[in-house]
Amino acid sequence: MNQNCRNSVEIAKTSINIVDNKSSFYRLGYHGEKPKFVFTENEEKVLNDIIFSCIQSGFDKKDIAILSLKSNNHLQGWINSHSLLYQTTTDIFDNDRILATSSRRFKGLESEVVIVVGVEKDDFADVIKKANMYVAASRAKKDLYFIINNNICSIDDIAALSNSAPGFSKKGIVSTHYQVKVQDDV
């Protein structure tokens, strides 16, 4: 394959850099939003804020997928505490619900917006976990978010663990309290 047809150059580059792949096929795709890494102590609040922002931007609920790097059980607490309607199966898609599932179950599928939850420091260091994170990230077509509990993993942790991946560093990633911002490249 010599052209990326699923996602933007920015999403493809981030996905590839997670697994330290030196591929450059992503340069042939279209340009879009930069993926956003959100460091927070309140993952549920940020998740709701991102979903609300996506819906306000014109995405339908069916266009949003919440992918856990852990099992579906990891999502259950969040699903029970939110007023949004979620579905946890990929067998039947419901236009009025946001899909919440594990990245492993979502392999081979895609979504306009992917929100990756349950990210921990080990996910950037372990080869198998990086492959799982690549699967989650590469499912996004237009917008990609990583929600990271800053009590578990900091931006410096990720930068240190990702030294071998070209272009993947803390440069350009800014997180603020409940808001997502991405700096322009310097």
Outline where the language-model segments fall.
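The feature marks helicase ATPase cores and/or their adjacent C-terminal helical subdomains
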Residues: 1-186
